[in-house]
């Protein structure tokens, strides 16, 4: 019997996206170009987080393969992702979020 069940398996780099509401003035002060993404080192990350220290960020799973898998899960496709996840708060947040999106 032929297996007709659809599933998707992705391998990628799990990341955590921190989402913070910012004004155009905030972006100018921080030297950030609107509508872009940039990986930053720990020093730059601390600088940006310190600037927004009074605003609680929202955390979302990121990375191109994991984002694709999350989208597939949202379409009702059995979806799985593999990647190295740290044993820290961000790793816990990541696992919690992808499970809520229905990813295995």
Question: Which residue stretches match the model-derived regions?
Answer:
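Glycine-rich phosphate/adenosyl-contacting loop at the front of the ribokinase-like
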Residues: 1-82, 89-93
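"Short basic amphipathic alpha-helical interaction patches in structured regions
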Residues: 84-85, 97
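A glycine-rich helix N-cap at a beta->alpha junction
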Residues: 97-104
């Amino acid at each position: 019997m032929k297996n007709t069940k659809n599933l998707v398996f992705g391998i990628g780099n799990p990341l955590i996206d921190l989402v913070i509401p910012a004004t155009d003035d905030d972006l100018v002060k921080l030297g950030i170009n609107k509508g872009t993404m940039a990986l930053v080192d720990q020093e730059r990350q601390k600088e940006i987080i310190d600037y927004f220290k009074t605003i609680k960020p929202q955390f979302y799973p990121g990375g191109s393969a994991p984002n694709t898998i999350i989208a597939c899960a949202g379409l009702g496709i059995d979806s799985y992702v593999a990647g190295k996840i740290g044993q820290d708060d961000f790793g816990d947040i990541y696992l919690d979020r992808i499970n809520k999106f229905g990813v295995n």
